[in-house]
Every structure is written in structure tokens, then in C-alpha cells.
Amino acid sequence: AKFELPELPYAYDALEPTIDKETMNIHHTKHHNTYVTKLNGALEGHEDLKNKSLNDLISNLDAVPENIRTAVRNNGGGHANHSLFWKLMSPNGGGKPTGEVADKINDKYGSFEKFQEEFAAAAAGRFGSGWAWLVVNNGEIEIMSTPIQDNPLMEGKKPILGLDVWEHAYYLKYQNKRPDYISAFWNVVNWDEVAAQYSQAA
């Protein structure tokens, strides 16, 4: 089996003005597509690995031969991160979480606004390229960030919300103003999908 680039669940211009059409197009058809292509290339001749699910593959990198481990980590991580990221956004997104996710956030951070501040700090504070995440870890939620294309599954944590802070994710529109991109992100967060990811992880 070969890994494939998933279709976006909306048009390239659907997240305007938060994320511009050109960024979405390049990010999906070029950046994400390259991770998929390179992942498939790395797995050539490794039939046992090709038959694993993507999450299984990156959850257990020790099972990947050392000579392709870095390629699988970077490109498998990139494929997993972006496949989730697209689903976590919606043209009908924004607002606040409800239900169990809202309860968890309020219990842990005191308020949704305080959670937003801490998540934004993790995203802004990630030096260079990487991601900010809300994850489920042993039944509890926590905020973390990862370098490059590392995914929380590599540390045994389940991501339920993620934000790409690579410059390619925002530079065409926001240039060096990463904090502006981070604050705009809340306008497109798909809290229904976050809730679905949470219920799978909890």
C-alpha cells in the first residue's frame, strides 16, 4: 500500500481571509505532497512497514530500520501532522469548544481565554520550524510544542489540536508576524473535529 495525499475538506480559498488561497494551495499540493512522496520513497522495499497505518508507523519509530528512520520520522510526521491539520480547520470554524473538551480546558486552564494565551505562547515560543499542540496524555490534556515535523504520537501523546508554525504556513500573508497568524487561527478552528479527536483519544 502507498500513502496518499488526502483531499482538502474545503476549497483552497475557503479559509480566507485567515489563510490565503495561495498559501493553502502551495502548502497542500507542494509541501504536504512532498512529505507523502518522500515517505513512500523511504519505505520502498519495506513491505511490512508499508502495511502499517501512518499512526502506527510514527508511534513506533524504533521498529523502523535505522537507515530510513530519520526519513520516516520527518516525512511520516509531516504527512500525519498535515493530514490532521487540514481537518482541524473549517470555513465554519471559530467560536469556542463545547462539551467535554470545554470542560477539560476550563478545569485545567481556568478559562478558554487563558488556554488560548498558553497555546499561543507555545506556538510563538517554538524557535524555528515546528508545531504547537493540545494533546491527551494519560487521560489529561496538555499543551506542548514539537520541532520540525515531530508528532506527539512519537512521545505516546495523542494530538487533538495542532498549529503549524513553519514559515511556509503563514509567510505569504503574515510575513514575520507569527503572533498575528496565531491569533487569526482561532477564527478557523473546527471544534467539532477537536471533540471527535478527543473522544478517540480519551
From Swiss-Prot:
Family: Belongs to the iron/manganese superoxide dismutase family.
Keyword Manganese: yes
Cellular location(s): Cytoplasm
Cofactor note: Binds 1 Mn(2+) ion per subunit.
PANTHER family (alphabetical): 37S RIBOSOMAL PROTEIN S26, MITOCHONDRIAL (PTHR43595), SMALL RIBOSOMAL SUBUNIT PROTEIN MS42 (PTHR43595:SF2)
Major localisation: cytoplasm
Assembly mode: Homodimer; under aerobic conditions. Under anaerobic conditions it is a component of the so-called 'green protein' complex (GPC), which consists of at least two components, SodA and a nucleoside diphosphate kinase (NDK).
Source species, domain of life: Bacteria
Catalytic activity: 2 superoxide + 2 H(+) = H2O2 + O2
GO cellular component: cytoplasm
GO MF entries: metal ion binding; superoxide dismutase activity
Name of this protein: Superoxide dismutase [Mn]
Modified residues (Phosphothreonine): 34, 70
Gene name linked to the record: sodA
EC number: 1.15.1.1
Key words of the record: Cytoplasm, Manganese, Metal-binding, Oxidoreductase, Phosphoprotein
Cofactor needs: Mn(2+)
Positions that bind Mn(2+): 27, 82, 164, 168
Role summary: Destroys superoxide anion radicals which are normally produced within the cells and which are toxic to biological systems. Active only in homodimeric state.
Name of one Pfam family that matches: Sod_Fe_N
